[in-house]
Amino acid sequence: MTKEMWQLARMHELKDFGERLSHYENDEMLIDEVDEGFCNMMGYTQSELMIRSCGKVGDLVYPPDYEEIRYQIRKNLKQSGSYTCRYRMRKKDGSLIWVWENGRYEKDDTGRKNIRSLVVDVSREEKTMRERDTTYDNIPGG
């Protein structure tokens, strides 16, 4: 099994992931649609999510992460038509989650460039990595 196939199989085992379809308008990434998995991960119904975010992806991103993520996504989409990034999002209950996002351009029937993204909650993995780093940092001579 290739690494890519293993990662895809692993994604299907995860419960906290979803898809988002968006596009750029006036330098803002706007949400066109989200699936049920994305809404469940964020704690919203679809209508609540659209109202809360005003249809803007940036309104769901944790503000300290927003500018860097925005820059990286635009840069990578321009260079290769796809991107991968990690950042934090705020859920309906106010808690933060770490997400891994992989997106790419795809054209719709009208020729408009849309961005299809897979967004996965990687909070557990992020917590484990941070705890490991803290442990290593506290080892004498480490």
Language-model segment annotations:
Residues E28, D32, C39-D59, Y66-Y71, ...:
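PAS and related sensory helical modules
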Residues F17, Y83-C85, K92, I97-E101, ...:
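PAS and PAS-like sensory/regulatory domains
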Residues P64-R86:
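Terminal output helix/cap of sensory domains in signal transduction proteins
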Residues Y24-E25, R88-G94, K107:
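PAS-family sensory domains
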Residues F17-H23, G142:
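Short hydrophobic secondary-structure edge segments in sensory/regulatory modules of signaling proteins
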Residues E101-L118:
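Short loop/turn elements at sensory-signaling interfaces that couple input to output
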Residues M1-Q7, V120-T134:
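PAS-associated C-terminal cap
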